[in-house]
């Protein structure tokens, strides 16, 4: 069963529909994040979906939240032993009509003030970073060593932020100096240091499992009482990261990936990048789903059972 859009009939107020997530308000301090099976590429949502993708994103995010729990606070509400998320929601949402839309793809989260940056960390040069480097020798305005090849590892992971665009708009790559202007120098520095630390820990873990995390996008909030930075949204999923096959990794070319790159390549080859109303052929749906599942199983060590 594929869920492309949740309909809760006003039981909880809908706060927003993002590219993938439907967000509902549970109470003044709590939100319900529901990961649908929608998939977007080049800032456009495809007409059809990837079955169970939202469940996979949710389970993988939960895995990484736990993995990083000693390194950073996250926005998850603790679910008491023996309870489920439905014990914290209006009873009506346990009815089959609603439960089937929410089960295994929902996170109950604390509300936090969002830091208005897409916090991207790059360990390897690829994508828009590679294109910029070829033209100017820089990445997000930062001078890079000469002679880097496509897909090569940077000497150190780098913080390359972008703006958080409204849906339908494009995120814009900015320099760390511009990020400091947006959110303040101290907060920008703290976010950059934390993001690089989290990425590095996860990159090392994934490498042992045979997956290279080339880059990823974090989002952070701030606890306005304690000034602590909080890890929010999704974490290190195939939607927010580039995952490469470590066994076939080769510097100087594009890589075999477990993420949306496969879909992006198909769109580009068919001159459909950025075009609205695109329906993916079944084989692209199936192969994208298979790549997401392989990434999940490899990283978590758990068999996909849906």
Curated annotation (Swiss-Prot):
N-acetylserine modification, residue list: 2
SUPFAM superfamilies in the record: SAICAR synthase-like
CDD domains noted in UniProt: SAICAR_synt_Sc (cd01414)
Entry-linked PANTHER family: PHOSPHORIBOSYLAMINOIMIDAZOLE-SUCCINOCARBOXAMIDE SYNTHASE
Protein name stated in the entry: Phosphoribosylaminoimidazole-succinocarboxamide synthase
Enzyme Commission numbers on file: 6.3.2.6
Note: Present with 4280 molecules/cell in log phase SD medium.
Highest taxon listed in the record's lineage: Eukaryota
Subunit structure: Monomer.
Record bears the keyword Protein biosynthesis: no
Family: Belongs to the SAICAR synthetase family.
InterPro entries xref list: SAICAR_synt/ADE2_N, SAICAR_synth, SAICAR_synthetase_CS
UniProt GO MF annotations: ATP binding; phosphoribosylaminoimidazolesuccinocarboxamide synthase activity
Reactions it catalyzes: 5-amino-1-(5-phospho-D-ribosyl)imidazole-4-carboxylate + L-aspartate + ATP = (2S)-2-[5-amino-1-(5-phospho-beta-D-ribosyl)imidazole-4-carboxamido]succinate + ADP + phosphate + 2 H(+)
GO BP terms in the entry: 'de novo' IMP biosynthetic process; purine nucleotide biosynthetic process
Name of the top EC class for this enzyme: ligase
Coiled-coil residue windows: none
Keywords (A to Z) from UniProt: Acetylation, ATP-binding, Ligase, Nucleotide-binding, Purine biosynthesis
Pathway(s) served: Purine metabolism; IMP biosynthesis via de novo pathway; 5-amino-1-(5-phospho-D-ribosyl)imidazole-4-carboxamide from 5-amino-1-(5-phospho-D-ribosyl)imidazole-4-carboxylate: step 1/2
Stated role: Catalyzes the reaction of 4-carboxy-5-aminoimidazole ribotide (CAIR) and aspartic acid with the formation of N-succinyl-5-amino-imidazole-4-carboxamide ribotide (SAICAR) in the purine biosynthesis pathway.
One of the Pfam families matching this protein, by short name: SAICAR_synt
Keyword field contains Ligase: yes
GO cellular component labels: cytoplasm; nucleus
């Amino acid at each position: 069963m594929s869920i492309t859009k949740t309909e809760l009939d006003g039981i909880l107020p809908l706060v927003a529909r993002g590219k993938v997530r439907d967000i509902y308000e549970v109470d003044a301090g709590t939100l319900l994040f529901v990961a649908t099976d929608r998939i977007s590429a080049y800032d456009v949502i495809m007409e059809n979906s990837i079955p169970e993708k939202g469940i996979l994103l949710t389970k993988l995010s939960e895995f990484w939240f736990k993995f990083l729990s000693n390194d950073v606070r996250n926005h998850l509400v603790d679910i008491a032993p023996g309870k489920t998320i439905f014990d914290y929601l209006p009873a009506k949402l346990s009815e089959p009509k609603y439960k089937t839309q929410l089960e295994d793809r929902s996170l109950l989260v604390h509300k936090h003030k969002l830091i208005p940056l897409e916090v991207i960390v790059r360990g390897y040069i690829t994508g828009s970073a590679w294109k910029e480097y070829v033209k100017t020798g820089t990445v997000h305005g930062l001078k890079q060593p000469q002679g880097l090849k496509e897909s090569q590892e940077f000497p150190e992971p780098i913080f390359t932020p972008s703006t958080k665009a409204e849906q339908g708009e494009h995120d814009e790559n900015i320099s760390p100096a511009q990020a400091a202007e947006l959110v303040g120098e101290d907060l920008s520095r703290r976010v950059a240091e934390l993001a690089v630390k989290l990425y590095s820990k996860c990159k090392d873990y994934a490498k042992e499992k045979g997956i290279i995390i080339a880059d990823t996008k974090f989002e952070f909030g701030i606890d306005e009482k304690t000034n602590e930075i909080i890890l929010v949204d999704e974490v290190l999923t195939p939607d927010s990261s580039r995952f490469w096959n470590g066994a076939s990794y080769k510097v100087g070319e594009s890589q075999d990936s477990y993420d949306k790159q496969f879909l992006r390549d198909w769109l580009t080859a068919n001159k459909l990048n950025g075009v609205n109303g695109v329906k993916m052929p079944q084989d692209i749906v199936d192969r994208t789903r298979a790549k997401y599942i392989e990434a999940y199983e490899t990283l978590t060590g758990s068999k996909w059972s849906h």
